[in-house]
Each structure stands twice: as structure tokens, then as C-alpha cells.
A protein has these predicted regions:
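Active-site anion-handling motifs in enzyme catalytic cores
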Residues: 1-283
Length: 283
């Protein structure tokens, strides 16, 4: 595989471009580098991709992701009281000790965890979900009240959920738009999905990004320059650690934190470049 085989050869502007560390050798062959140089400067979604291209002599810069511009169409001035947890990150390393600990914890917090388990989008038995969710509830209740966790809506954006429930690209696009409109009106979104978190920034919806602090390079390379835009809760050694000052999020009207505004410059630059490109293509 090389870029020439997957990208157009006529008038083109490359923005929000990403190369994963697993694909860098295949994507940075001499013919691909030549193609990129013909179309530079290259706007890169993350600093990892930018640095890869700069090292190859390609004029590149950090552009951010196009999803930061979704607020131009989908931002909603009307907000509801809904809180969405979209694949919030948590991980339990199961052994006999952690299993016993989970069962004991569940005995003391069964009612709250059971209410979450009944609507948590996992295809597992009810009891198994409850045991798994002890890790989630134990850590997330440090930052969110029981009322928030119990009443929140839980959404799965994993690939298998879509492949099982949507049969066409048109149906998938419709579902994506439905979710974007939900997030646009949300009081708060908590997610490990970058393409949920970035649109929330663009739509000015309060968002907290959750991550695995020990993720692989192939995963971490996607976030360079983007992670700095978020309020982050990092899962490290079985515990959540915030990178921002946060009290416990409860059912009051205001939070003790706000989204960073750094994304606004990136979104404006992306919009301007796209509009300029479209106008130039008709001249």
C-alpha cells in the first residue's frame, strides 16, 4: 500500500492527515513521500504524524481534526440535563484477589451498580456485568455523584456494535448524525472515544476525555497535540487520575471545570483552509 493508490491525483488539499505507527513503513515509501511533497504543506491531525513527515523532509504542520468544525452545523444553544458516558475507560486485571474484592464491593453498592448494569451496553449476563462494573463505579464515583452515574445514558461506539446493528453506510451516517445531535445538547459527555470528544469541543459541550495511561504506541500516537485540548481522566494502575482541577460532578447546574478554548484556533484555521480551497477550485 502507498498513498498514491488511495488518494486522488488531481486538485487536492491534505488536512487532518494521520499515519498510525503500525502503518508508517507502508505509508512512507519513496513514492508516497514524493506525492506528499507535491501537495505540501500537509495538515496533520496529530503531532506524531507531523513529526514523521518533517523527518522525511515534507513540509507539515499540526492542523487538528476536522471534527472540531462540526459546531458550525450542529452546535445547539439549547442544552438538556442529560449526561452521556460513551465507552468510559476502565480496566480490571482479574485474578482471585480482584474477583473477591469486586464481589465484596458489589455487596455494599449493589443497588447503584445494578441500575447502571441494566442499561450498560455490554452483551454479558447481568451478574457478570455487575461484577465488571465494580471497577468502573469504584473509581468514577470519586469524580461523579451516585445520581449522575445512575441516571446517565451509556453508549457504545465500538465497531462491533455498528456492524451488528447497521447494514449500510447510509444507516451508519444516519446514526452518526443522531449521536452528534445528542452530544450537542448534552449537559456533559465523558468518553474514551476521540471522535466523540473532539466534536463535543467543537459544539461547546462540556467533555471529559478518559484514557488508558499505559496504552500502546499504536494507540497513543493518535493523540499528540489533541490530548492537550481536553480535560483528561487517566486510568493508571487501577485508579483514575485527573489532569485538571475537578470537584465531584453532581446534579447542580454548574461544574468546577470548563473546556479548554485552544481548539477554537484550530477549528477556525481548518474552516478557513477548506473554504479557501473550495473557492480556489472554482476559479
Amino acid at each position: 500500500m502507498n498513498l498514491i493508490s488511495v488518494l486522488p491525483q488531481d486538485l487536492i488539499a491534505i488536512l487532518a492527515f494521520h499515519i498510525n505507527s503500525k502503518a508508517k513503513d507502508a505509508m512512507l515509501k519513496p513514492e508516497s513521500i514524493s506525492y506528499l511533497k507535491q501537495n505540501e504543506p500537509i495538515g496533520c491531525r496529530d503531532t506524531y504524524t507531523r513529526d514523521l513527515l518533517l523527518a522525511k523532509g515534507v513540509d507539515a504542520y499540526f492542523s487538528g481534526c476536522m471534527t472540531l468544525t462540526l459546531g458550525r452545523k450542529y452546535e445547539s444553544l439549547e442544552k438538556d440535563d442529560k449526561v452521556y458516558f460513551v465507552d468510559p475507560y476502565f480496566l480490571t486485571r482479574w485474578n482471585w484477589k480482584s474477583t473477591i474484592r469486586a464481589v465484596v464491593f458489589l455487596c455494599f453498592h449493589f443497588l447503584a451498580i445494578a441500575r447502571i448494569a441494566r442499561k450498560y451496553p455490554e452483551r454479558k449476563s447481568f451478574i457478570r456485568k455487575c461484577i465488571i462494573l465494580t471497577g468502573f463505579y469504584r473509581e468514577y464515583r470519586k469524580f461523579f455523584s451516585e445520581k449522575i452515574l445512575v441516571n446517565a445514558t451509556y453508549i457504545c461506539q465500538q465497531d462491533r456494535c455498528y456492524s451488528e446493528n447497521f447494514s449500510s453506510d447510509v444507516a451508519l451516517l444516519g446514526e452518526a448524525e443522531r449521536l452528534v445531535r445528542l452530544y450537542a445538547r448534552a449537559r456533559l459527555v465523558v468518553t474514551s472515544r476521540i471522535h466523540c470528544a473532539l466534536p463535543c469541543l467543537g459544539m461547546r459541550t462540556p467533555v471529559i476525555f478518559t484514557e488508558n495511561a499505559d496504552q500502546s504506541e499504536a494507540s497513543a500516537c493518535r493523540f499528540g497535540g489533541l490530548r492537550e485540548l481536553f480535560n483528561v481522566l487517566s486510568w493508571r494502575n487501577g485508579h483514575l487520575e485527573p489532569n485538571f482541577v475537578v470537584g465531584k460532578v453532581d446534579d447542580k447546574n454548574k461544574f468546577d471545570f470548563a473546556n479548554s478554548t485552544q481548539w477554537m484556533v484550530l477549528a477556525e484555521q481548518l474552516s478557513d483552509k477548506c473554504l479557501h480551497f473550495v473557492k480556489a477550485s472554482y476559479e
